[in-house]
Amino acid sequence: MPDPLTSDLLEKMHAYWRAANYLSVGQIYLQDNPLLEVPLRLDHIKPRLLGHWGTTPGLNLLYVHLNRLIKQHDLNMIYIIGPGHGGPGLVAQSYLEGSYTERYPAIERSRNGMQRLFRQFSWPHGIPSHVSPETPGSIHEGGELGYSLAHAYGAAFDNPDLIVACIVGDGEAETGALASSWHSNKFLNPARDGAVLPILHLNGFKIANPTVLARIGRVELTELLRGYGYEPDFVEGDDPAIVHQLLAGTLDRILAQIRHIQDEARNHGVTARPRWPMIVLRTPKGWTGPKFVDNLPVEGTWRAHQVPIADFKAPEHLKLLEDWMRSYRPQDLFDDNGKLRDELVALAPTGHRRMSANPHANGGELLQPLSLPDFHDYAVTLPAPGAVRAESTRVLGKYLRDVMKANLESQNFRLFGPDETASNRLEAVFEVSGKEWMAEVEHVDINLSVDGRVMEVLSEHLCQGWLEGYLLTGRHGLFSCYEAFIHIIDSMFNQHAKWLKVCATIPWRKPIGSLNYLLTSHVWRQDHNGFSHQDPGFIDHVANKKADIARIYLPPDANCLLSVTDHCLRSRNYVNVIVAGKQPEWQWLDIDAAVRHCTAGAGIWRFASNDAGDPDVVMACAGDVPTVEALAAVKLLREYVPDIRVRVVNVVDLMVLQPRSEHPHGLDDRGFDELFTTDKPVIFAFHGYPSMIHKLTYRRHNHHNIHVRGYKEEGTTTTPFDMVVLNDLDRYRLTLDAILRIPRLSGQREAATARYWDSIQRHKLYIGEHGDDLPEIVDWRWTA
């Protein structure tokens, strides 16, 4: 069989690889003399050497070969790099293709441009060392490892002509998130979705240790990958000429396999889960770099991971670096002006076929707004506040069902969750779409479909990664999850929020659909599952992020939940967190009042207030269960103190509590004072940890009078009301808090305290005997 590459093409591709490697080394080391036109001097070298060489030559090799495939077959392909510390490689490739100069005209394709390219890398106010948002063609920074394959599959969903080449580092492959991501092939429909080509880059070492997959033997590794449902092809070697031919032939064969799988599914229907191809590329870490430094082996070892030659106080190191860089023969690669030679330029694709200029890697360029039904049509009808009970998320489920239905043709909306869609009472969506499933099916299964648009897998990492990949390539989605277990992806949220923050500063990065979380089965109604399921702290985590990114909503009822969700699905470039219960709760606002309330973010509930502008106390609340307890406390206060003047303030958008100087949603001081006064006690019943309210309001005039009750890390398997009692968020405690802080009621404090303890004692005795809450709690309802 003839070699897939002619000798001429092999020589040119090898030269292109050398050029990319040369530019990569130059970025790590040089601040001047980019073409080595004069002997290398110490002042040409950066004072601080930062970056990672070890993975870069392998990444560059793959890029060159994928370019051949793209150009030969006119492919639509993007490149995701799991080991994103190989940032110099993708920067070099986008520079060689010209897309870098298109985005950053000052980095022209010339000697001066190359010098600026080198100097800016890992330089103050330059560019980061990883495949960051500043890098054309990137949707995955790869700083925190483990998410590349999930992002790749998310990008491929509903993109039938897209191939996502995903480089999985063998160190990255040891992470839990990546381990679960291999199973994504059970959720990829070849008739409707694109293809993912996983390439396991087996260079053998991490920072200072061998990698597990490099040390288990080829047979065991093959069995492992086949067990995940892939057909691995191995490309191994350290002789570039041999590896070039092997890799080219393997890619040709794999492309044919991908096309066969897709053609069969698209022409004859999906009859079985295909075994998708993948590549295992085993090449030396730090390939083409120095073999030894100070008589210690470097190439092919962990010493090649970062900066192989670091100490230039030793004169021989300067020569070693110069010899290394000259080994790429830059004079053969670039003309006298520093531009890549034309015969090499011709190897790369052009226009949007360049992976560094593919619009899927700048998803905002492709983003189309969702077709959204009128959420007013799903409203709970209320004759009066507190007259009707409803399950808020079940109401929302009907709206999401029709969001799904309205966008079936455009195929740009999916719902994600870890086996909780039905549990979270969103099952109305199954009237329109099943759950995507390409694995085996048994007769007891329900709502499974090869064409499903509900993505359920019991891995929060995978749900988050899929959704991020889906959003980053220009689509929309929502992630529904138990509140306590969303913490599993705390760090993934961090990375996405950082990505959005940086993208907002890059003019050519177009806004993408917001990352929308619906957190339900929340802390106050996890009484049946116990302490492990009780944690409202994700909103604290989110609130730490930039104000132009983070949004947190605590709708008190179903109509507010509808209004907030519609708003979030229309938004761009945010992380929206919505916390809402799924259990039957009293409903407070009709749909028009809900819209006004959510638009304002916070407001006085006139139906529950009688302060006439001069309250004795402000009873504030945020969250559905705290709202019930606050209103129940208001009723008790009026019973105990008939002439008391109470103002009820409900907060649905937590960020309004911050000053406007801190958050764009923040109320100005006058607006805040109109709600909370400047001198009256505020008893704040809060869904989460009390410290969050203090953090948000510490600059406000009346902060010293704000007394917050919320979750204080007390819980067990108990009754719903006992949960609030355990955390001092119950109506009896809130009532006592108010009386203790109203100066004119000082004479009632002793009696009020005794009454409180009597109520708590009755509660404890009753639940201990009956296993349920007191009738006065279970049967409570609001009356004006």
Swiss-Prot record:
Pfam families: XFP, XFP_C, XFP_N
Keyword line: Lyase, Thiamine pyrophosphate
HAMAP family hit by this protein: Phosphoketolase
Keyword Lyase set for record: yes
Family from the record: Belongs to the XFP family.
GO molecular function terms listed in the Swiss-Prot or TrEMBL record: aldehyde-lyase activity
EC number: 4.1.2.-
SUPFAM superfamilies to which the protein is assigned, alphabetical: Thiamin diphosphate-binding fold (THDP-binding) (SSF52518)
Cofactors (names): thiamine diphosphate
Superkingdom per UniProt: Bacteria
Upper lineage: Bacteria, Pseudomonadati, Pseudomonadota, Alphaproteobacteria, Hyphomicrobiales
GO biological process: carbohydrate metabolic process
Enzyme class: lyase
Protein name per UniProt: Probable phosphoketolase
InterPro entries given in the database record: Phosphoketolase (IPR023962), THDP-binding (IPR029061), Transketo_C/PFOR_II (IPR009014), Xul5P/Fru6P_PKetolase (IPR005593), Xul5P/Fru6P_PKetolase_C (IPR018969), Xul5P/Fru6P_PKetolase_CS (IPR019790), Xul5P/Fru6P_PKetolase_N (IPR018970), Xul5P/Fru6P_PKetolase_ThDP_BS (IPR019789)
